[in-house]
Amino acid sequence: MSKAKMPIEVKKYYKRELYQYRKNKDILDDIIAKKEKANTRNILFLHRRIENIETVISKLNSFEKEVFDMIFNQNCDWLYCKTVRNIDKSTYYNIINKCIYLLAEEEGEI
């Protein structure tokens, strides 16, 4: 993982994308299940974002995947992660930053 500096706006954008992953996946599943008439461009864009995040998840090791699930799917803060799994604050934020960096790399931002 490179130490490339990324603008704060870009970092916030990709962090928001990671938090919206589960919601976006549910929206796409609903559209497909109901066979709604939706804009094809929007469906493709949503599908591409979901695939990129799934690629990021596949690059993580098992511990990081577990922490990823706690952070982005269960919306657990650092203190909860420390209490439940004894995850250090630096580890918590390192995993967040690693996911953001990998997602930016997948999107071609870096």
Regions found by a protein language model. Name each.
Residues 74-91:
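Helix-turn-helix DNA-binding module
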Residues 1-59, 107-110:
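N-terminal interaction/assembly modules
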